[in-house]
């Protein structure tokens, strides 16, 4: 039961409601926060042939970010991984009329993808939904899937101390919106998790209520 939805992310009802809920919660800013993750991708893509680049969106959800990537890069090889079949069905609807993506129903910590097969891996608002040990397992799996020199583009909620004026909101958020793992996420050592997996820091910034971290596999 996440976000007061019985069945969590595994139901058709949740897939239909998710985007409306998120845009309402963030006062219409969820889309712009997601789009901030396109900037490091654009920097990485400078001088590269998009037809030769593979991007994997981990926990792609309803496909809003995959759609944004597809609009920006019509020929890029896209893969979306998600645990929820209803959410993957919603992703297919998001990509209707565009070149599609390979959609894979699987947990993020056990992706059926070859090692060193992705140039870019994106994680958009996933980690705050995960138990601490699963965050670490997913990070290790992302590092496995990335090619050497490949890019992780990570976008999630602010953490405590990122913007001290918002710390009260971050503290209240898990109770108000039934986020069972958010409280630990808000104080977790993301820098340490990524570094331990061999993902070296490139950039960290905080667009509105989100935290954007860019890491490169050594």
Regions found by a protein language model. Name each.
Residues 1-44:
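Conserved Class I S-adenosyl-L-methionine-dependent methyltransferase catalytic core
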Residues 51-61:
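Conserved class I S-adenosyl-L-methionine
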Residues 56, 64-110:
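Class I SAM-dependent methyltransferase SAM/SAH-binding core
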Residues 109-121:
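A short acidic, Gly/Pro-enriched loop at the edge of an enzyme's catalytic core
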Residues 119-133:
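A short SAM/SAH-binding and catalytic strip from SAM-dependent methyltransferases
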Residues 136, 153-197, 203-205:
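C-terminal alpha-helical "lid/dimerization" subdomain adjacent to the S-adenosyl-L-methionine
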Residues 136-148:
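A short glycine-rich, Lys/Arg-flanked "PGG" loop and its adjoining helix->strand segment in the class I
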Residues 197-218:
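Core SAM-dependent methyltransferase catalytic element
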């Amino acid at each position: 039961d996440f976000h007061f939805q019985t069945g969590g992310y595994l139901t058709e009802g949740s897939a239909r409601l998710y985007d409306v809920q998120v845009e309402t919660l963030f006062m219409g800013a969820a889309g712009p926060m997601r789009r901030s993750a396109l900037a490091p991708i654009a920097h990485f893509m400078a001088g590269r042939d998009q037809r030769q680049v593979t991007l994997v969106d981990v926990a792609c959800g309803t496909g809003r970010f995959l759609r944004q990537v597809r609009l920006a890069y019509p020929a890029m090889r896209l893969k979306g991984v998600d645990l929820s079949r209803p959410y993957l069905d919603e992703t297919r609807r998001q990509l209707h009329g565009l070149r599609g993506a390979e959609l894979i129903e699987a947990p993020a910590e056990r992706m059926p993808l070859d090692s060193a097969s992705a140039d870019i891996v994106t994680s958009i608002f996933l980690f705050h939904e995960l138990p601490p040990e699963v965050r670490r397992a997913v990070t290790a799996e992302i590092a496995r899937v990335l090619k050497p020199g490949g890019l992780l583009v990570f976008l999630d909620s602010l953490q405590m101390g990122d913007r001290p004026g918002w710390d009260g909101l971050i503290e209240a958020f898990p109770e108000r919106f039934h986020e069972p793992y958010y409280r630990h996420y808000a104080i977790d050592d993301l820098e340490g998790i990524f570094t331990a997996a061999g993902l070296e820091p490139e950039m960290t910034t905080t667009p509105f209520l989100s935290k954007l971290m860019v890491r490169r596999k050594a």
